[in-house]
Amino acid sequence: MATRLCPDRAQALIGEILYKWEWEKEMSYEKLNEKILEMKDEMFDTIRENVAICSVKGEPEEDAPYGREVKRALDHLLSVGEKMGFKTGNVDNRVGWIEYGEGEEMVGVLGHVDVVPLGEGWNYDPLGCEIHDGKMYGRGVQDDKGPTIGAVYALKAIRDLGLPIDRRIRVLFGCDEENGSSCVEHYIKVGEELPTIGFTPDAQFPAIF
């Protein structure tokens, strides 16, 4: 026989549940921040390694549709993902991805490894990824290698901490964002899985769109 709760007791019970949920959420955020800080040096090294690759669009080759250096940058991040133990995929060297989690639905996190030409006027080596006064300098640090690699390490932190997620998370590495995003068009055209929802950690995310 069901027990009927009085309104006051029901309200109190709901309050207890919400308090517990908020507390667990806050604790998860704290653990996540601690884990990311713990991995900071490793993450910075990965950013440096990728920024050192001058992945400006080049002459297409049979296995490198956007040029050899763009493929090198893609291969580097796929290798990082494999070493972390993530599931990885490579769509004709145009889009790569790493994935974690279970479920029918997939959240897409779309970044890119290609960059615009180095240009002039740098105070520091654009491929050196130097840190001065708490700021990292290099082509792609902000657009979009740094944020993309940050997303990879955020996913690693979620996995390592065993935080609950109810759908798969896929971090995608585009290779032609700076020249029209034909890479994403190809991903869709060949029938790759589309996310249920997603976001792009590009440049000054989330302040610009």
Regions found by a protein language model. Give the residues of each.
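Histidine/acidic-residue-rich, glycine-tolerant segments that coordinate divalent metal ions
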Residues: 166-209
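Predominant activation on well-ordered alpha-helical scaffold segments within soluble catalytic domains
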Residues: 48, 78, 149-156, 185
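Active-site metal-coordination/substrate-binding segment of hydrolases
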Residues: 106-173, 179, 193
